[in-house]
């Protein structure tokens, strides 16, 4: 069995391993390919603070996010803290990389460490997939991965130099409101031409609001249909378990100002 593992990791399949398929697996693979929501809800595992490794049970707004990502090229999401926005995003990117060959995906965050953490969560979900759903692994480290189908994922900080010179099918910008305005503007002026040159390339921006900046401008323009982004807004009360009692307790343990900043989008 060790002959089939990537660098001795029993949870990863190396490249050029012949897969023997059952009829049921062929049907299931086809269903997963066609339906990202089915794939995520059936096969993606995430780490819960209270329960450890568990299936990803999606909230209604998370399902809406995935559907919007899948059907549109440009999406911008405004969500409160700790709402599962990043988990939703990496689950979609996992599906996209598995079932679309030769795609390049960039996971970009305001800090490189945050981007690497997001990639790490995607890698954990990947390791917990059945082997017949996995692509063979070509390379696998803290900053990037490459699969046998030619798809690659890069994790980096959001900067013009991060993806300059490369062509990307999906650019995911996490907590974009926290990227300094000058960096955000340089990034878009450098990267947008390569994105706009494709017909199926995607830009997905997900953030908690943070003042008047490029995220604010893109969000406002999306709401008023001055750009091509599809806006998705989630209120803290849409997250199960968050009610008025939770709000009052959170304010008591922090402050009303902090609550308004992080949860009252």
What does each model-found stretch correspond to?
Residues 2-265:
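Phosphate/NTP-binding elements of NTP-utilizing enzymes
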